C-alpha cells in the first residue's frame, strides 16, 4: 500500500509538472520576445528590468521597439522549452530521465514569467509614451510651415498705379489754360495776322507758349509796339544828321515786320540801290538830275546797311527814277545836238 501511494503521488506530480511545463512554453512564447531581446543585447541585460525607483531611458527606446517584433516572429526555443516539449510527449521517459520538479518550483516559474511580461509590457508602454510627444510637436511645425508658405505667394507685388496718373491730371489743366488764353486773345484782339492780309503783324508761332501778359488797350501785340518805338528812335537819329532825307521817310515801320506776302517782307528779295545806273547817268548832259540820282543811290545803300529796308527801298526807287530821266534826257540832248550840227553843215 505504501508503495502504491508513493507511485500515485509521483504520477500526480508528473502530471502537474507536465501541465505547468505545457503552460510554461505558452507563456514563454508570449513573453519571451522582450526577454530574448534582452538576452541578445549583452550591453543592457540588467538595465531592462526597472525597479520601482528606476525609469527606462528614452534614448534606447528606438532600437528596442524595432527589435521586438523581429524576435517575436522567429522565437528561439530555449533548452527549458525543449525539455518541456519532450516531457509532454513522453512523460514516463521524462520522469525517469530527470527528477520531477516539485509543484512549488513549477508554480514559481510561471509566476516569475508573468512578472517579466508585465515589466516588458511596462517598458513597451513607456517607450511609445516617450516617442509619442515629439510627433505632435512636429505636426504643428509642419502646419506652421504650410501656413507660412502661402503667405508670400498670396501677396502679389504692389503695383505703382499712381505714376501714370499725374500726366493725365495735368492734361486737362493745360487744355483749359490754352482755351482760356485763346478766348482772351480773340476778345482782346491779340490774334496774329495771317500771311497775305496786307497788314503789318508778327508771323504766327504755333510752338511758342501763350503769353500771360495782359493785352494793351489798343489791341496791338507788345512786340510790334517795341519795334515801332525802336524805328521811331532810328528815324529821329537819321533826321538829326545833315544831308539826310526827311524824318517822315524813316519813321515808317520797316518792312521786316510785314508778312511774307507783303512787299519788302521776308519773302521778297533784297532792295537794290541802283548806284551803277546813277553813275552811268552822270555821263549824260543832265547834270543836276544825274547828280541828285547818284546822291539818292548812296543814301539807299547806307539805309540798307543800317537795317532800314523800307527807307532803302524808297530811296532806291527815287535814285532809279532820276537816273533814268537823266539817261533819257542826255540821250535826247545828244541826238538833238548831232542833228542840229549836221543840218547846219549841209
Swiss-Prot record:
Record topological domains on the Extracellular side: 345-346
Residues where Omega-N-methylarginine is found: 246
TM ranges: 324-344
Pro residues biased stretches: 153-164, 203-213
Region (Disordered): 1-222, 235-267
Pfam families, per database record: CD225
Gene Ontology annotations for the cellular component aspect, listed alphabetically: axon terminus; dendritic spine; glutamatergic synapse; membrane; neuron projection; plasma membrane; postsynaptic density membrane; presynapse
Sorted UniProt keywords: Cell membrane, Cell projection, Cytoplasmic vesicle, Membrane, Methylation, Phosphoprotein, Postsynaptic cell membrane, Synapse, Transmembrane, Transmembrane helix
Membrane topology of the entry: Single-pass membrane protein
One Gene Ontology MF term: syntaxin-1 binding
Cytoplasmic topological intervals: 1-274, 296-323
Protein task: As a component of the outer core of AMPAR complex, may be involved in synaptic transmission in the central nervous system. In hippocampal neurons, in presynaptic terminals, plays an important role in the final steps of neurotransmitter release, possibly by regulating Ca(2+)-sensing. In the cerebellum, may inhibit SNARE complex formation and down-regulate short-term facilitation.
Residues the record lists as Phosphoserine modifications: 28, 98, 102, 244, 254-255
Organism of this sequence: Mus musculus (Mouse)
Tissues/organs with expression: Neuron-specific expression throughout the brain, with the highest levels in the cerebellum, basal ganglia, hippocampus, substantia nigra, and neocortex (at protein level). Highly expressed also in spinal cord (at protein level). Detected at very low levels in the heart, lung, kidney and skin.
Intramembrane residue stretches from the record: 275-295
Encoding gene, per UniProt annotation: Prrt2
Any one GO biological process: negative regulation of short-term synaptic potentiation
Name the UniProt record assigns to this protein: Proline-rich transmembrane protein 2
